[in-house]
A protein has these predicted regions:
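Hydrophobic residues in well-ordered beta-strands that form the structural core
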Residues: 117-118, 175
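C-terminal segment of classical bacterial N-terminal signal peptides
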Residues: 14-24
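A fold-wide structural signal in alpha/beta-hydrolase
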Residues: 87, 112-116
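Cap/lid segment of the alpha/beta-hydrolase catalytic domain
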Residues: 95, 99-100, 107-110, 119-150, ...
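Bacterial N-terminal signal peptides that target proteins for export
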Residues: 1-9
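Short beta-strand element of the alpha/beta-hydrolase
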Residues: 83-93
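Primarily recognizes the serine-hydrolase "nucleophile elbow" in alpha/beta-hydrolase
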Residues: 60, 145-198
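N-terminal cap/lid segment of alpha/beta-hydrolase-fold proteins
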Residues: 28-83
């Protein structure tokens, strides 16, 4: 009987402390960590993508006149052939590129896959100055819950499909957090028609 009572008390304590911790963290949420430009190994390739859009403009396919220059870093395994190399596009979450991305870059490289790490945040870090979204968003990286990742993904796919060393039939996408949403939504036909390249 004592073991059951102790189990109930321990479980109740863990549940209550977990709820209290979550509330504290959410109440004092400072936002994403301070942004810094990621300088990974490989060839830095700049490309044009969309600025931060309102969710309404994204869903309606409204293309703004202005573009943002963002970039990705293309890295080939040491033993990669001169052509037909498969590649994985990596899309990060709201907080930018972290250690988990480094793990995936290393793991994919060890499997003989090239990687293209897209930095969606750094080129848009001044979105509050450059747009009319100042009142709508607290952090640039959080705007639209990462829907710009979808557009970045399409542009990256087009860019890589024309690269002389990449096999255009073997391009994948791997993302974490908002980047995972970006990879998932690349498959949505509606978004392909609005933002992808036919």
């Amino acid at each position: 009987m004592n073991k059951i009572l102790i189990s109930i008390l321990v479980t109740a304590f863990l549940v209550i402390s977990n709820l209290a911790t979550s509330t504290t963290v959410l109440a004092g949420d400072p936002g994403p960590p301070k942004e810094k430009e990621w300088k990974g190994k490989g060839e830095k390739i700049e490309f044009q993508s969309m600025p931060i859009l309102t969710i309404k403009d994204f869903l309606n396919g409204v293309v703004p006149e202005k573009r943002n220059t963002i970039w990705g870093t293309l890295n080939f395994p040491a033993n990669a052939p001169d052509k037909n190399v498969p590649v994985v596009v990596l899309l990060h979450g709201m907080g930018g590129i972290h250690e988990s991305a480094e793990f995936w870059l290393s793991a994919l490289k060890s499997m003989g896959l090239a990687t293209f790490m897209v930095d969606s945040n750094w080129g848009r870090k001044k979105c509050k100055k450059d747009s009319n979204l100042k009142k709508d968003i607290k952090w640039c990286a959080a705007a639209n819950r990462g829907m710009n990742r979808v557009i970045d993904g399409y542009v990256a796919l087009e860019l890589l499909s024309n690269h002389p060393r990449i096999d255009p039939k073997r391009i994948g996408c791997l993302g974490n957090s908002l980047g995972a949403r970006g990879c998932l939504y690349l498959n949505v036909k509606r978004f392909q028609n609005m933002w992808g390249t036919p």
